[in-house]
Amino acid sequence: MKISSHNIKFGAIKLLSSLAPSKKYPDVEYVSIPQMDFLGYSRLIIEDLQKYFTTSHCLIVQSDSFVVNSSLWKEEFLQFDYIGAPWSNKIQINPNLVLHLEKNPVGNGGFSLRSRKLVETTAKINFNSLNFPMKAE
């Protein structure tokens, strides 16, 4: 988080985790959440993320991602509801199911900027009612 927030002014920096950080930083608010699996995390992002931020946008930075060059930030990014890392063109779910994502290659939310409007809209989705081969946020 310290790498991703270097030279960037955020409205707030929050660490949502089931584990308390070993080192505390005055500008990072630790928010305790239950330990969860892949589906639990997807449910959190789809149904509950809006509970954790009050700003116009939220930058999600998972433990395997970080901001590389903060000087590339543009205020125009805030005009979009979602900016995220690309998926592979094909994702093998199981031996009999391959998702072809050539027409919609964006959706990898591990490093993504999401608007409050988008997050409040997805919160209306009943995660358990989703009928997809892969329930990824």
Positions of the model-derived regions?
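Short, acidic, metal-binding catalytic loop of nucleotide-sugar glycosyltransferases
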Residues: 2-11, 25
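Short, conserved loop/helix-junction motifs that constitute active-site signature segments
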Residues: 7-8, 52-54, 74-78
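Short, hydrophobic beta-strand segments that form beta-sheet elements in well-ordered domains
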Residues: 9-18, 83
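Generic structural signal for small/hydrophobic residues in well-ordered secondary structure
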Residues: 13, 63-64, 115
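Active-site-proximal specificity loops/subdomain of glycosyltransferases
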Residues: 14-56
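Short beta-strand-to-loop acidic/aromatic patch adjacent to the donor-nucleotide binding site
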Residues: 55-68
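Conserved donor-nucleotide/metal-binding helix-loop-beta segment in metal-dependent transferases, i.e.
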Residues: 65-100, 104
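Catalytic core and acceptor-binding pocket of nucleotide-sugar-dependent glycosyltransferases
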Residues: 104-137
